């Protein structure tokens, strides 16, 4: 296991430290393991999961605080760009072309995995295109540093990130990942699909075997595609179900659109009563959510269906889900056009 190998190296180095060197608790330039919240974290991990206390402390001693991450997390919210501008960023000609090439390079795997999980291949490709430009940009922060920094030096979300740090330690134990070299985003998301440790452990699958150990989500493309498909499948993706539809809008002036709502709290019929006509033939009782999708020339709206909601479970943003859908359609069209 990677954990045991890394710990043997770490503990050997500690054993060879010269007399008078800083003790383990001092953690020079790192985290002070005597801090109450860190000591409590170690106690919990050891008692809940049976990990060796010395092993856990040896790994945490290697974590380095990252002030830049705290700066990113506390940065004032900038003016939100309009949807059309957000869309242009993610639907560049380059990203569409790269997506089509990626699809053709992995055509057989995409067909098999799409059939197995009943998720269209274009959505698997689009998610990877938006998350990491098809695996090219997976993050440069050490995951150990990122998670420890947010777990112990970022009070607003320390509970969430302590849980993810705990999950990362378990992932290290179960996989071949090296805790000292594994890199990811500033929030600790990993690999081509940008899975957090808890998601990695729960949804990552090996496409070609029944092995239970977590797969490589950086270079094993069958596992990467299967893991994204499995994630969407587990959240209830409906085969052949719609994702988005355009609208014709003449709304009731009293009708309020909730800008951050992702829940399917309307139906096609209820929207119709407020002057919103859905440009897709679906039953009137179909649950939907109305989404603002402003264009260069003014307001516009779309409706999201169940599969749209499923995409927001990957990233809780309506604009993200719209971008995934639009990139999926653009890449699929490019692939179709190139083969006709």
Which residues fall in each region the model found?
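Bacterial N-terminal signal peptides that target proteins for export
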Residues: 1-9
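Bacterial N-terminal signal peptides
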Residues: 8-18
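An acidic, Gly/Ser/Thr/Pro-rich helix-cap/linker signature
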Residues: 22-114
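A contiguous strand-loop segment
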Residues: 27-28, 32-37, 44-62, 158, ...
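Solvent-exposed loop/turn segments at secondary-structure junctions
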Residues: 64-65, 131-135, 189, 238, ...
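Acidic/His-rich structured neighborhood in mature extracellular/periplasmic domains
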Residues: 85-229, 233
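Flexible, glycine-rich surface segments
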Residues: 179, 183-296
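C-terminal functional modules
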Residues: 283-340
